[in-house]
């Protein structure tokens, strides 16, 4: 939809974000918040999600596990031990029992009232406001598609993985509508190189590739060149140095050096269009200062 001035008008913020992703000429850089605003709220909690929505983050990365009675809940770990005041495997406990435990803050102190949210609750908070990257969840693909269809959010939910193309195509063939999907390429591994080559040889162009590398050199340079030639976009993780070129290249380096341009600028120069971060406010401020985010 466009207004009389020629500027596009979108019904929802999600429509705008998707338009930027799908526009090959856009210089907008999407910000992905890893587990939400976990420095101020418990990771993967509703307040952590609401906080990054208020910041203007584009994608909320969250992790999913399934309870004993098949309820999808938000948690990175297989166990309750680190993120709640409970103990044991999430897969061994019912949802009702899970609700007797409270979430912990990042420093380990238990909150007064916050419980582990369900994926349903999180998606309703995110609907029309922010894209959702559901991580650690490919085994629940069918269940997640069913839920997103029920809630009307399938088109704003993203899943990533390093599975082969045929496996992904087969899994998606079971559904009329599918989640967005992005391949993850570990650029130094033989499996990663093989997967990248398969996309190139088949002439397939996913919305973006997530690249993971721990040192500079030909491996990452070759991947970047191939992706630019294909016309896809590049997703970079700055959450840990081991995922983005080694020491001195991650969020903490940007923060501790007080030099976000020196760290994040190299990924802009590389042509990255999506950056996952543990410091969303720092990254947003930098991108806005150079006109690459709104």
Residue ranges and their predicted role:
Residues 3-294:
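Phosphate-group recognition and catalysis centered on beta-loop-alpha active-site segments
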């Amino acid at each position: 939809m466009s207004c009389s001035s020629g500027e596009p008008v979108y019904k929802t913020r999600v429509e705008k974000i998707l338009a930027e992703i799908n526009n090959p000429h856009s210089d907008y850089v999407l910000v992905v918040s890893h587990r939400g605003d976990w420095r101020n709220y418990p990771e993967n909690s509703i307040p952590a999600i609401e906080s990054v929505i208020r910041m203007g983050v584009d994608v909320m990365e969250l992790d999913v596990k399934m309870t004993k009675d098949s309820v999808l809940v938000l948690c990175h770990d297989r166990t309750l031990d680190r993120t709640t005041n409970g103990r044991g495997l999430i897969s061994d406990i019912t949802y009702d029992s899970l609700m007797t435990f409270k979430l912990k803050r990042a420093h380990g102190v238990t909150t007064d009232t916050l419980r582990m949210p369900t994926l349903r609750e999180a998606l309703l908070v995110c609907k029309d406001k922010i894209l959702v990257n559901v991580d650690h969840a490919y085994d629940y693909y069918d269940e997640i598609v069913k839920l997103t269809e029920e809630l009307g959010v399938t088109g704003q939910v993203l899943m990533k993985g390093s599975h082969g193309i045929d496996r992904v195509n087969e899994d998606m063939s079971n559904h009329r509508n599918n989640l967005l999907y992005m391949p993850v390429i570990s650029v130094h591994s033989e499996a990663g190189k093989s997967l990248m080559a398969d996309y190139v040889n088949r002439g397939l162009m996913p919305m973006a590739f997530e690249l993971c590398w721990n040192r500079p050199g030909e491996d990452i340079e070759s991947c970047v060149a191939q992706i630019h030639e294909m016309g896809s976009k590049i997703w970079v993780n700055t959450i840990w140095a081991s995922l983005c070129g080694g020491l001195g290249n991650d969020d903490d380096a940007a923060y501790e050096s007080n030099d976000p341009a020196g760290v994040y600028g190299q990924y802009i120069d590389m042509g990255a269009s999506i950056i996952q971060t543990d410091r969303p406010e720092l990254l947003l401020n930098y991108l806005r200062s150079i006109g690459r985010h709104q």
